[in-house]
C-alpha cells in the first residue's frame, strides 16, 4: 500500500474498531476492498493470536500421535484466513478449504493466504454461507471462529450438525471472550455433546459446566502491535490483550490426568494459587515453595494451560 492507501486503511480501521465495540466484537459486514484491508490491519492480528493460542491448547490436549494425524482442515467462515494460518502452525496441515461468503474478505483472504503460506499448502476457497452450504467431503479438522454468536440457535444447530458430520477427528469453535459469547458456546457444547461428541478442551470432561450461571470461562493472549497497528488502534501501547473462549470436540477419547487453569495464577511470596477445573469440578489449589517442582511449575503456568501437579486445596 502507498501512503494514501495506508492512511485510508487506518481511518477505516478506527471506524471498524468502533463498530466491533458496539457489537461486542461479533461479526461486522465488510462492504469494500478498503474495509477488508482495514480489518487485516486492525482485527486480524488479534483473531489470529487467539486462534493460535487455542489451537496450541487443543494440540496439547490431544497429544501424540493424534495431533500429528491432522492433515486436512475446513475453515467455516474463514474471513481472511486467520484461523487457518493459526492451525497450520499447530498441525501439519497440507489441505485446506476456506468457506467465506463476504466477497471482499474472500478476495483479500485468497491473496493473503497465498503470500503467507507459500506453495506447499493446497488451498481451496468457496463462495458460500456456512449455514447453507452442503458439505460433501470430510476433513480431519473443522473450525469455526468468531462466527457462531451471529447465528440464530436453529441455524447454529443445523450448521454445527453439518460440520460435525464431516469432521474426521476434531471440531474447534473459537469466539470473543465475553459472557454473551460464552453462553452461546455452552449452547454449542450441549448440542454437540448430545450428538455424540467427546469433549477435548478446555473442559476436562463432558459433564455439566460447574461454573455458576453468573460466571464464565475465558482466556487471553497478549500480542505485539506494529507501527501501523498502533495507528489503527489510535494508541501507543506496544501490545494488546485479546480475550477469547473456545471449545474443542473429538471423535475419539483422549486421556488427560491434569486440570485446566481457568484464572490467571496468583503469585505471592513463597506460594502460588491456581483456580483449576478438573474431573472433580472447580477447586482452588495453593502450591508452596516447599512443594519443589510443583511450585516451579505453578510459577511458570498461565491461564488456559493444563496443570498436572495438583497438591492441596486452599
Protein language model regions, located:
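N-terminal auxiliary segments of SAM/dcSAM-dependent transferases
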Residues: 1-25
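A short SAM/SAH-binding and catalytic strip from SAM-dependent methyltransferases
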Residues: 140-154
